[in-house]
From Swiss-Prot:
Residues 46-205 form the E1 domain. Residues 749-763 are annotated as: Interaction with DAB2. Expressed in placenta, brain, heart, lung, liver, kidney and endothelial tissues. Residues 32-692 are extracellular. Residues 211-299 are annotated as: Disordered. Interacts with CPEB1. Interacts (via NPXY motif) with DAB2 (via PID domain); the interaction is impaired by tyrosine phosphorylation of the NPXY motif. Interacts (via cytoplasmic domain) with APBB2/FE65L. Interacts (via intracellular domain) with APBB3/FE65L2. This is Amyloid beta precursor like protein 2. May play a role in the regulation of hemostasis. The soluble form may have inhibitory properties towards coagulation factors. May interact with cellular G-protein signaling pathways. May bind to the DNA 5'-GTCACATG-3'(CDEI box). Inhibits trypsin, chymotrypsin, plasmin, factor XIA and plasma and glandular kallikrein. Modulates the Cu/Zn nitric oxide-catalyzed autodegradation of GPC1 heparan sulfate side chains in fibroblasts. The record marks 320-321 as: Reactive bond. Residues 717-763 are cytoplasmic. Residues 270-282 have a biased composition (Basic and acidic residues). InterPro entries: Amyloid_Cu-bd_sf, Amyloid_glyco, Amyloid_glyco_Cu-bd, Amyloid_glyco_E2_domain, Amyloid_glyco_extra, Amyloid_glyco_heparin-bd, Amyloid_glyco_heparin-bd_sf, Amyloid_glyco_intracell_CS. It comes from Homo sapiens. Residues 1-31 form the signal peptide.
């Protein structure tokens, strides 16, 4: 009988254990944290997470994880710390049985009862923000998302900030969306109480703010007077009590009770809490409480309090400490640094500029919002909807110009009716007046259109460059991965080729549009367009040739590469055929016919011979000059030098508004350098022989002639295109064209990611 009972009890225990495991499965993060606490505690099961609390002048407090109660410092000597590292060390001392790895400031303040001063028996309650002692590996908090609320997260690996900074960031993020912060947590620790990001929940704002009633405030004041006139804490309650909706404005008051008992002044904290509005209208009652009927505070009253705080002058106070702080300067409309003495002062006293601006930003006059699509376009930065916003702005500009012209036309007609009986000379003067008005309007419209187009082209150019640069860096990173993954390399290569193709297609569309609208201008820019396309082609081929470093991967994805290049080649062949029908420069046309051969599959790595030291014929150009980096700088970096040297779009530049991409600007030195590069590579492919001295002489003469031609064009056309800043470089006639081109690019400070990759491979 006893055995049967024991078996039944064991079965029941196993069933309860399985049920418990099933219920706790969705909360793996919390279970893992409790597991870590239980494993490290050694004695008993932890019912609370380890925390410590500090208040200058009082003994440090820590939570007993077995009882959940606050206990004073066991040594009876330690008080507040100055650095987070000291806080971490104290956590490790208080919880030696736990593996404390970091500390983090809590989101909410807590009230600690019977908190005694150091070396005294005065014990009072105190509100304070504790520090959490994090156990083991960092686990982010689990955030609940109520109905009609939204979850967000921010991660910036280049930023490593403390808890207070991210709190300010998420508050601002919620406010910009017309919502208020509900809860938040830290992500990705990068130091002691420092993190790379945060996650947070925003909820709709409410119109009525619940607060402590007047009667409760009076009772609190009476109780505080009985407790030696302790500081008054006005806590405005929220319908969502999980958010730390109480913010401190300053730490600046002297505890008057202790002045009579102690010889020196002891600085304590005067927490003045600021209320953050929360929740949506759906949380209100059917009959919302009327402001003022039960002591509630409205948004208007909160704004009045903020104005009263932020309009105060900065006060150092009577103490002589040196504490850098921030205050809001009403005359300047921004937060300014000042030195706080450590006591006294007023509430216009903040620990950081971000915190100061977050509280006092209501004091800054709002910037007038743009009234039409044109102003909106100029006021906002580029994004994925750049083209659509540009089209709207262009249409708005045309409507504005048309309305102005209609108004002038109407005035002109009315003036003609009234001037029928005037002498001919006066009528002629009237006509000239309105003609001048029309001409001025046309000129103004052309100027506005030019500014709009230049802005659009600059933004598109920047977007194309950024996308290509990111795609190339990802491709190089995939090649450097150990071991290389063919699928990942192919995926990164596709993105890179697609980015290059977008640049190429925009350039082609640009030229085709100019050719249809202004053939003369198209003839002038033809060589520039073809040079730009050649640079794109060479840069892409050189990037593809990097696959030689991992030949077995390249052989595996060879077919996919051929298909990818065939798609790109089809559009290029069509454009080459169309552009060859309107030859402008015989030399350029013949060059392009040689530079763009019919499509053939890309094979950068033939079957490797038995001698692994022998490299494919494709890499012969890399043996010239100063090594691998020259081809890298000459091909991949050629376009980057021109783009990076264009600091801004020239204001005198006239471009049609329908263009979708930049017009590349190459001066004679730039074009000459590229032509020298092509002519220097030619002998390697075609095997014709020229003496090096004759070749150098011809190249120098060509560069001189091209320079004279370009200078003449600049003087005639007043340099309509954006200027490119080139330093004065002494050209050594004994250098090869590749070396001269590399020197020019290095003088401009350019260094591309492929060069770094090849340099690392050599090391």
């Amino acid at each position: 009988m006893a055995a049967t009972g024991t078996a039944a009890a064991a079965a029941t225990g196993r069933l309860l254990l399985l049920l418990l495991v099933g219920l706790t499965a969705p909360a793996l993060a919390l279970a893992g944290y409790i597991e870590a606490l239980a494993a490290n505690a050694g004695t008993g099961f932890a019912v609370a997470e380890p925390q410590i609390a500090m208040f200058c002048g009082k003994l440090n407090m820590h939570v007993n994880i077995q009882t959940g109660k606050w206990e004073p410092d066991p040594t009876g000597t330690k008080s507040c710390f100055e650095t987070k590292e000291e806080v971490l060390q104290y956590c490790q001392e208080m919880y030696p049985e736990l593996q404390i790895t970091n500390v983090m400031e809590a989101n909410q303040r807590v009230s600690i009862d019977n908190w005694c001063r150091r070396d005294k028996k005065q014990c009072k309650s105190r509100f304070v923000t504790p520090f959490k002692c994090l156990v083991g590996e960092f686990v982010s908090d689990v955030l609940l998302v109520p109905e009609k609320c939204q979850f967000f997260h921010k991660e910036r690996m280049e930023v490593c900030e403390n808890h207070q900074h991210w709190h300010t960031v998420v508050k601002e993020a919620c406010l910009t969306q017309g919502m208020t912060l509900y809860s938040y947590g830290m992500l990705l620790p990068c130091g002691v109480d420092q993190f790379h990001g945060t996650e947070y929940v925003c909820c709709p704002q409410t119109k009525i703010i619940g607060s402590v009633s007047k009667e409760e405030e009076e009772e609190d004041e009476e109780e505080e007077e009985e407790e030696d006139e302790e500081e008054d804490y006005d806590v405005y309650k929220s319908e969502f009590p999980t958010e730390a909706d109480l913010e401190d404005f300053t730490e600046a008051a002297v505890d008057e009770d202790d002045e009579d008992e102690e010889e020196g002044e002891e600085v304590v904290e005067d927490r003045d809490y600021y209320y953050d509005t929360f929740k949506g209208d759906d949380y209100n009652e059917e009959n919302p409480t009327e402001p003022g009927s039960d002591g509630t505070m409205s948004d208007k009253e909160i704004t009045h309090d903020v104005k009263a705080v932020c309009s105060q002058e900065a006060m150092t106070g009577p103490c002589r400490a040196v504490m850098p702080r921030w205050y809001f300067d009403l005359s300047k409309g921004k937060c300014v640094r000042f030195i706080y003495g450590g006591c006294g002062g007023n509430r216009n006293n903040f620990e950081s500029e971000d915190y100061c601006m977050a509280v006092c930003k209501a004091m800054i006059p709002p910037t007038p919002l743009p009234t039409n699509d044109v102003d909106v376009y100029f006021e906002t930065s580029a994004d994925d909807n750049e083209h659509a916003r540009f089209q709207k702005a262009k249409e708005q500009l045309e409507i504005r110009h048309r309305n102005r012209m209609d108004r002038v036309k109407k005035e002109w007609e009315e003036a003609e009716l009234q001037a029928k009986n005037l002498p001919k000379a006066e009528r002629q003067t009237l006509i000239q007046h309105f003609q001048a008005m029309v001409k001025a309007l046309e000129k103004e419209a052309a100027s506005e259109k030019q500014q709009l187009v230049e802005t659009h082209l600059a933004r598109v150019e920047a977007m194309l460059n950024d996308r290509r640069r990111m795609a190339l860096e990802n491709y190089l990173a995939a090649l450097q991965s150990d071991p290389p993954r063919p699928h990942r390399i192919l995926q990164a290569l596709r993105r890179y080729v697609r980015a290059e193709n977008k640049d190429r297609l925009h350039t082609i569309r640009h030229y085709q549009h100019v050719l249809a609208v202004d053939p003369e201008k198209a003839a002038q820019m033809k060589s520039q367009v073809m040079t730009h396309l050649h640079v794109i082609e060479e840069r892409r081929n050189q990037s593809l040739s990097l696959l030689y470093k991992v030949p077995y991967v390249a052989q595996e994805i060879q077919e996919e590469i051929d298909e990818l290049l065939q798609e790109q080649r089809a559009d290029m062949d069509q454009f080459t055929a169309s552009i060859s029908e309107t030859p402008v420069d015989v030399r350029v046309s013949s060059e392009e016919s040689e530079e763009i051969p019919p499509f053939h599959p890309f094979h950068p790595f033939p079957a490797l011979p038995e001698n692994e030291d022998t490299q494919p014929e494709l890499y012969h150009p890399m043996k010239k000059g100063s090594g691998v980096g020259e081809q890298d700088g000459g091909l991949i970096g050629a376009e980057e030098k021109v783009i990076n040297s264009k600091n801004k779009v020239d204001e005198n530049m006239v471009i049609d508004e329908t263009l979708d991409v930049k017009e590349m600007i190459f001066n004679a030195e730039r074009v000459g350098g590229l032509e020298e590069e092509r002519e220097s590579v030619g002998p390697l492919r075609e095997d014709f022989s020229l003496s090096s001295s004759a070749l150098i002489g011809l190249l120098v003469i060509a560069v001189a002639i091209a320079t004279v031609i370009v200078i003449s064009l600049v003087m005639l056309r007043k340099r309509q295109y954006g200027t490119i800043s080139h330093g004065i470089v002494e050209v050594d006639p004994m250098l090869t064209p590749e070396e001269r081109h590399l020197n020019k690019m290095q003088n401009h400070g350019y260094e591309n990611p492929t060069y770094k990759y090849l340099e690392q491979m050599q090391i």
